[in-house]
Structures are given as structure tokens and as C-alpha cells.
Amino acid sequence: MSRENNSRFAILATLVAFLLVGGISLILWAVTGRLDSAERIPSQSTNVATGNRLPESIRSKVSAGEQVLFPEASEDKTEAVEAIAQGNYANAVTVFNSALEDNPNDPESFIYRSNARIADEEAVTIAVVAPANGNTDIGLEILRGAAQAQSTINRNGGIDGMPLRLVIVDDRNEPEVATAIAQTLVEDNSVVGVVGHYSSDVTLATVPIYEEGELVAITPVSTAVELSGISPYLYRTVPSDSFAAAALAAYAIFYEEDLNVAVYFDAQDELSASLKEEFISFVDAWGGTIVEQYDLSRANFDPRVQREAQQNGAQALMIAASSNTLESAADVINYNKRRLPILGGDELYNRNILEATGPDSLALTVAVPWHLLARGVDEGFVTASRQTWEGDVSWRTATTYDAVITMAAALDEAPTREGLKQALDSSDFTVESATGPVNFLPSGDRRQVDRLVQVQPGRRSGVGYDFVPFVVDGESEE
């Protein structure tokens, strides 16, 4: 690539970031509005931290430490959970210490141990919603960020002098389950805020419930554009798909100079469809062409459709996968055999993708909100996370850490639902966190852009290939 095109790409990327942060979210605000909700006083008949009066269908998916939600619990972990259920908190802490010595990378045990240290002390309660059964690896990534944030907050004096208690909620990443859980959280007056959900489809399903119940939710991972401005009670610490799509389209057209792109997506998934549509809009605006579109969710999907795409002039592939179509996405990557560059959304930032595709993954360029090796990251957070989890953490861990830290900072002045909402809406509200300053546009979107990562041979993932920050020729991450 020429030095001139390097310069064009860098200038364009900066301009796009400025326009997106300052413009798109504000336009969405003007178009969609954020409806005022009627007053509603939550019921005090349930308590998710204790399981009091919870329906059995919900009780089995909620835990502050009295039951294990994630599969494959060790004997020590099972014993510690039983100790919490019996109110023997000191013993629970001791046994959790043993469990974490054997498996230091287990955030569920980490959170339960922190809760056991609080015991029956008055605390501020936040619910963290993550899939424990199905998409388990993603759920664990989310919980690592929440667990590390809880530890940091409590070590530094808590929230308004009170410790932070986290309640883990497994919504199975299913809209029907998530809406029932959201209603339960709204009705529990002890829960002052929610961190979640995972997929954009699930978050979209729960938004009306949180708005009606006037309960703030901060999602650390849902990126669909449709979430921008949808409710005054929804915020996110992750950029919307507009930022990822712009970064990927700019890379394809102005850096690789690939004007013709074939797109793969999941027609059944809101996030996938959102990223696809945004990407197409930017490609069209910048003079490129979408030569073909293929649905990864089709029962008879065949990666050999790439031959048709190339016959029609495709110079690059873009994969907007969902969590349900990662296997098909891996098939596309493997079939490509590095013939064409492949662009992807953050769902492809996944160790399983690297493992399944091996050297074929070297064609990948992926847009993500954060990377621990990128220039300007919070080295303190990176060091602490490595010490805590004995390994590298993903962007999902970092943005979840942001969400919990942000919610705690907003609650510090007034640890109530109303106080949280007022603080987050303040024009001068800003919190320094793992991925940088956190503040929100009127749409609830964060003022942040995505960055690009590429695959190179490496050891960090344990499968021989790693995601590393993309650097424009002649620049350095140092």
C-alpha cells in the first residue's frame, strides 16, 4: 500500500471517529427519541440475593453464592456454596480460597467469595446478567470483568461506605428467559442496577421492562444500532455497530483498496443484521460494491458459495457472525484458505475461532472495542487482570469492568435507582476505567470508537495464533 493511501486511511479513520461520536448518536436521538416512562414503585416481595419468594423457574438461574450456576464445579466450590447457603460465611471464604487456588480463572467463585466476605452486612446490590448455560465462555468473560471490578470497589471503600454485592443471573441468552428475569429484577427493590445483557436480541427484549420499572441497565457487550436512544434507562460501555462498520469499511476500501466485498451474516440475529446493514451503508457511501450477501443461518449453508462471490468480482469477505453461527463462520474462513482478506465483527474475536481455523485465521481483521496490547490502554488494569486471572482478558471483560465501575461511581453519591439515573444523565459525568473515560451521549451510547485487530502467530491464546492490534504501515504501538 502506498504512503499516500496510508495517510488517506489514517485521516479518514480520524474523521469517521469524530463524525460518529459527535453525530450519528445525536441523530438517532433526534429521530427515535427517548420516551419518558410512567412512575412505578417496585414490589418488595422478592429478593434475588436471598432467593426469597422467587419462582422456581427463576430461582435456579439466580445466585449470590448459595448455588452454582456454571457447569463443572469442583468439590471445594460445591462445599463453599453449601456453606454460604447455611450462612457459614467464614468457612465459605476459606473453601473458596482453596477452590481458586486450583482454578484461579473462575470468576463465579471469585464473586461468591467476595459476597461471602460481606456476609449479612448491609450492601449495595447490582445484578450481573450473563449466559451460564450456552455461550458459557462468553459468560465467563463477562463475569471476570464484574468480579475484578467488585474486588476493586470493595478494596477502595465500597459505594457510599457500603460494600458491593453482585448477584449473578443466567438468562441463557434467550429472550423469553431474559424477560422473565428482567421482571423479577424490577420487582426486587434491593437491586439498584443491572449490568447486562449479552446479545442485542436479548437486550432489545428486556428494554421495555426495565424502562417501565425505572431500573437502569448498562450493557457491556450489546452493540446493535437499534439500541441507540431506545430507552432512557439503557446505557452501554461498548460502541455501537456504526463504529465497527465504519472501521471495517474504511480498512477494506482505503487501506486494502478492495472495492468489491461479499458479506456473510445471520438473518435471524439482530446484532448480525445491524452490523451488516451499517457496513453496507459505509461501503456504498465510499464507492465500494457489495457483490453478494449470504445467510450463515440457512440450514443448507455451504461455504463454497465463495466461488460464486469471486466470479462476481469479490476482493474481500466480511463476516457479521452471531454467537449461533460461529461454526459456519469458521467454515467460511477455512474454505477461503487466505485467498481473500476477511473482515469481521467482534463475535469473531473468539479463541474457538482461532482454534478451529488455525493458519487460515491469518486472513482475519476484526473490529473490537478494546485490546490489551493497543496503544494507550490502562496498564494498571491489564497488569491487575493478568495477576487476578493468570492470563490475558478479552474486550468483553474490559467493557464489563467499565460497566460495574461506572455504575458504582454513579451510585456513590446516592445509592438508589433514582440516584443512579440522575448521575449517569449528568452532563459532567465521567469515570476513568479500563478502556478509558466513560461518559454517555443522550442516546445512552458511549463516546468511544472501535479499533482493528489482526491475527498473527503467537502463544498468548494457547492455540498458536493471537489477535494483535492492527498498525498502519510506518506507525508503532509503542
Predicted regions and their residues:
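Extracytosolic ligand-binding ectodomains
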Residues: 2-478
